[in-house]
Amino acid sequence: MEDRCLIKNDITELIGNTPMVYLNNVVDGCVARIAAKLEMMEPCSSVKDRIAYSMIKDAEDKGLITPGKSTLIEPTAGNTGIGLACMGAARGYKVILVMPSTMSLERRIILRALGAELHLSDQRIGLKGMLEKTEAILSKTPGGYIPQQFENPANPEIHYRTTGPEIWRDSAGKVDILVAGVGTGGTATGVGKFLKEQNKDIKVCVVEPVESPVLSGGQPGPHLIQGIGSGIVPFNLDLTIVDEIIQVAGEEAIETAKLLALKEGLLVGISSGAAAAAALKVAKRPENAGKLIVVVFPSGGERYLSTKLFDSIRYEAENLPIE
C-alpha cells in the first residue's frame, strides 16, 4: 500500500473537524443526553478560527485583499481577533484590532505575540463606538480592509458548510436540539440552518446574558460572559431559525464552567459555561427525555485565567507554600 503524507501545508488546513464528547458527570437530573462540540480544539483555540479564515479567503477570492499588501482591521471581543491574527501571520497580513478594555489580559498578550496591533476601547462606547473607531483607523490605513464579522455572509456560511455537517455526521443524524451562544450570530445561524434542512424538527436554542437581554427585547448592559451579548441583534443572526432564547446569568456561566473543569476535565471559557448552563436547563425538561442535545463550546479556559472565572484558584496558586 502506498504511504500517504498527512502533513498539512499550513495552519489553515487544521481548521474544523473538531471532536464531540458526551457530558457525563454534570448531568444530574437530566433526561436528555448532552454532547459538546469542542471548538477549543481549533488550531488557535476557538470557534472564531473558522470565520477568520473564511472571511479572509472570501475577500481574497473577490480580489479585495492581497497577502503582503493589505491590512486587516476589525473590532473584536478577542477570539475573532486572535483567529485573524493567526491567519494573518500565516498568510502575510498586518492585523489591527479594536477590543474592549474589559477583555482578558491573556487575549491582549496572545494578540501581541501574534503580531497584531491592538487598540483598547472604553466599555462605555459599546459596539457602535468600536465600529466608529475601526472606521477611523481604516481611513488612515492604506490598503486597509474591515472583514465586518457581524455582517459578513462568509461568517454563517462557513458554519453552514462545515460546523453543521460535522455535527450531523458525528451524531449520525441523531441530534434533536442545538444550543449555541450568540456573539455575531454566525454559529447559530449557519449550523441551525444546515441542521433544520436535514430535519425540520430540530430545535435551535440560543444563549444570551440575563444582564444584557437584547435578543429578548431588553436593554444592553454590562455582563461577565466574554464573547456573547454584544448589545445588539446581530445582522448575521437569522431569528427565523431560532426556536428559543435562553438567558444565563454571568455567575451561573462561571460556576458551570468551573464544574466542567472539575467534573468533566474540560477547561472551557465563560461563554462555554453559559452554553452548558443553558443546555443543562433544556436537558432537564421532561419533554426532552431521550433526546440528544448538541452544545457548542466556543473556546477553552486558558484565555480567562486573569478573569473572575479563576479568581479563587489564582489566589490559591499564587500563595502556595514552598516546601
Curated annotation (Swiss-Prot):
Task: Provide a GO biological process annotation.
Answer: cysteine biosynthetic process from serine
On tissue specificity, the annotation reads: Predominantly expressed in leaves and flowers.
Q: Which SUPFAM superfamilies match?
A: Tryptophan synthase beta subunit-like PLP-dependent enzymes
Q: What is its EC number?
A: 2.5.1.47, 4.4.1.9
Q: Which cofactor does it need?
A: pyridoxal 5'-phosphate
**Where is the protein localized?**
Cytoplasm
The reactions it catalyses are: O-acetyl-L-serine + hydrogen sulfide = L-cysteine + acetate; hydrogen cyanide + L-cysteine = 3-cyano-L-alanine + hydrogen sulfide + H(+)
Q: What induces it?
A: By nitrogen starvation.
What does a knockout show?
No visible phenotype.
Carrying N6-(pyridoxal phosphate)lysine, the residues are: K48
| Pathway(s) served | Amino-acid biosynthesis; L-cysteine biosynthesis; L-cysteine from L-serine: step 2/2
Which InterPro entries has this protein been placed in?
Cys_synth, Cys_Synth/Cystath_Beta-Synth, CysK, P-phosphate_BS, TrpB-like_PALP, TrpB-like_PALP_sf
Q: Name one GO molecular function term.
A: L-3-cyanoalanine synthase activity
Sorted alphabetically, which keywords does the UniProt record give? Answer: Amino-acid biosynthesis, Cysteine biosynthesis, Cytoplasm, Lyase, Pyridoxal phosphate, Transferase
Pfam families per record: PALP
User: Matching CDD domains, A to Z?
Assistant: CBS_like (cd01561)
Which Gene Ontology CC terms are recorded?
cytosol; plastid
**Ligand binding (pyridoxal 5'-phosphate):** N79, G183, T184, G185, G186, T187, S271
Q: Which family does it belong to?
A: Belongs to the cysteine synthase/cystathionine beta-synthase family.
PANTHER family, per database record: CYSTATHIONINE BETA-SYNTHASE (PTHR10314)
Q: What does this protein do?
A: Acts as a cysteine synthase. The cysteine synthesis reaction is more efficient than the cyanoalanine synthase activity.
What is this protein called in UniProt? Bifunctional L-3-cyanoalanine synthase/cysteine synthase D2
Gene name of the record: CYSD2
